[in-house]
Amino acid sequence: MGDKGTRVFKKASPNGKLTVYLGKRDFVDHIDLVDPVDGVVLVDPEYLKERRVYVTLTCAFRYGREDLDVLGLTFRKDLFVANVQSFPPAPEDKKPLTRLQERLIKKLGEHACPFTFEIPPNLPCSVTLQPGPEDTGKACGVDYEVKAFCAENLEEKIHKRNSVRLVIRKVQYAPERPGPQPTAETTRQFLMSDKPLHLEASLDKEIYYHGEPISVNVHVTNNTNKTVKKIKISVRQYADICLFNTAQYKCPVAMEEADDNVAPSSTFCKVYTLTPFLANNREKRGLALDGKLKHEDTNLASSTLLREGANREILGIIVSYKVKVKLVVSRGGLLGDLASSDVAVELPFTLMHPKPKEEPPHREVPESETPVDTNLIELDTNDDDIVFEDFARQRLKGMKDDKDEEDDGTGSPHLNNR
């Protein structure tokens, strides 16, 4: 075929009897609605016999290690489960075919069974909590899984060899309209000083993209008789774990400590630049990351955009960011300044990916720069312009092969250990 095509991801069951086809692996949350999960499952009719084809979509919050499961208690909570009987189609599950499903059924034949899921917009985005250096197995966090299998009923126990499991992601992109420019100020009156110290800080904008430097403008008016010895700037990630009770964890992801002095009765103004990178935070256990799929690297978790009136109990992990500016003031005076000598302000901001440009119906198929398995991409040989690509993400250079993502692992970070 030519060098243009529509990419479709596929994954087959270990026994080779079922294959699921999806048009994408990332599904965008537009706040008021989420991209539908539409695809087809191709079934070997001799294997199907008199059974039915089921597809399930599960959103789960894994918050502990499987090896800690005792007495039937599991460290996992299913936030959302939906089931579709793909074949024979149940009347309540029958929906109009999407353009992708029409093309796939035309190409794959009559044994391709369509399925469609609607993800509620109030569900959390895919977030992974970074494991520690010694941790193995599945990481804690929120993930979405599509599972297809043949059975006489939904309650039938299915072996992994006879099913297809695909981990997909629910993602959000930065809004087109940024919020107001973050600014904050505070005034501190010190003992034995007639006049106060004033700190004002601002960011150059409200939305930053991953990998983009953050400019922090700091202005200090020191009318006291004390000296500002240091100025500490930090970017902090806050993760609200919404499970049984809401707990908040904070972690610095970029820091600068400047020995900039502000003498008594003087002013100071300077712009500091910090860039939060995951590469500089690889050892921080429990740091929130964007949901990670097999063979693909990720980044710091994006800020969570919430709908008004959203139920926080099913939001899983809510991520936010703040820049903290802290002045370290020299202690002095007869009483040694019993009150705290630090003066600080916080500046909330949004850290996200920009919304990608809409892809045209036909697109160039790029040559991969990273090594892939020889069977990773299969090109069809007829006139249709569909490119089938294995669902597994391309392997990163230097990354060892993982076990299949469905394997039960041990050693994930436990929330209580953060």
UniProtKB/Swiss-Prot annotation:
Residue list for modification Phosphoserine: 412
Chain positions with Phosphotyrosine modification: 47
Region of interest: Disordered: 353-375, 397-418
GO CC terms in record: clathrin-coated pit; cytoplasmic vesicle; cytosol; nucleus; plasma membrane; pseudopodium
Bias kind Basic and acidic residues: ranges: 355-366
Keyword Ion transport: no
Keywords: Cell membrane, Cell projection, Coated pit, Cytoplasm, Cytoplasmic vesicle, Membrane, Nucleus, Phosphoprotein, Protein transport, Signal transduction inhibitor, Transcription, Transcription regulation, Transport, Ubl conjugation
Positions with a binding annotation for 1D-myo-inositol hexakisphosphate: 250, 255, 324, 326
SUPFAM superfamilies, per the entry: E set domains
Coarse class of the protein's main subcellular location: cytoplasm
GO biological process: one example: regulation of apoptotic process
Ranges where the record places region Interaction with CHRM2: 45-86
Residue segments, region Interaction with SRC: 1-163
GO molecular function ontology, one term from the record: cysteine-type endopeptidase inhibitor activity
Free-text description of this protein's post-translational modifications in UniProt: Constitutively phosphorylated at in the cytoplasm. At the plasma membrane, is rapidly dephosphorylated, a process that is required for clathrin binding and ADRB2 endocytosis but not for ADRB2 binding and desensitization. Once internalized, is rephosphorylated. The ubiquitination status appears to regulate the formation and trafficking of beta-arrestin-GPCR complexes and signaling. Ubiquitination appears to occur GPCR-specific. Ubiquitinated by MDM2; the ubiquitination is required for rapid internalization of ADRB2. Deubiquitinated by USP33; the deubiquitination leads to a dissociation of the beta-arrestin-GPCR complex. Stimulation of a class A GPCR, such as ADRB2, induces transient ubiquitination and subsequently promotes association with USP33.
Chain segments carrying region Interaction with TRAF6: 318-418
A Pfam family reported for this protein in Swiss-Prot or TrEMBL: Arrestin_N
Cellular localization per UniProt: Cytoplasm; Nucleus; Cell membrane; Membrane, Clathrin-coated pit
Domain comment as written in the entry: The [DE]-X(1,2)-F-X-X-[FL]-X-X-X-R motif mediates interaction the AP-2 complex subunit AP2B1. Binding to phosphorylated GPCRs induces a conformationanl change that exposes the motif to the surface. The N-terminus binds InsP6 with low affinity.
Self-association state and partner proteins as the record states: Monomer. Homodimer. Homooligomer; the self-association is mediated by InsP6-binding. Heterooligomer with ARRB2; the association is mediated by InsP6-binding. Interacts with ADRB2 (phosphorylated). Interacts with CHRM2 (phosphorylated). Interacts with LHCGR. Interacts with CYTH2 and CASR. Interacts with AP2B1 (dephosphorylated); phosphorylation of AP2B1 disrupts the interaction. Interacts (dephosphorylated at Ser-412) with CLTC. Interacts with CCR2 and GRK2. Interacts with CRR5. Interacts with PTAFR (phosphorylated on serine residues). Interacts with CLTC and MAP2K3. Interacts with CREB1.
Record function comment: Functions in regulating agonist-mediated G-protein coupled receptor (GPCR) signaling by mediating both receptor desensitization and resensitization processes. During homologous desensitization, beta-arrestins bind to the GPRK-phosphorylated receptor and sterically preclude its coupling to the cognate G-protein; the binding appears to require additional receptor determinants exposed only in the active receptor conformation.
Family of this protein: Belongs to the arrestin family.
Protein name, entry field: Beta-arrestin-1
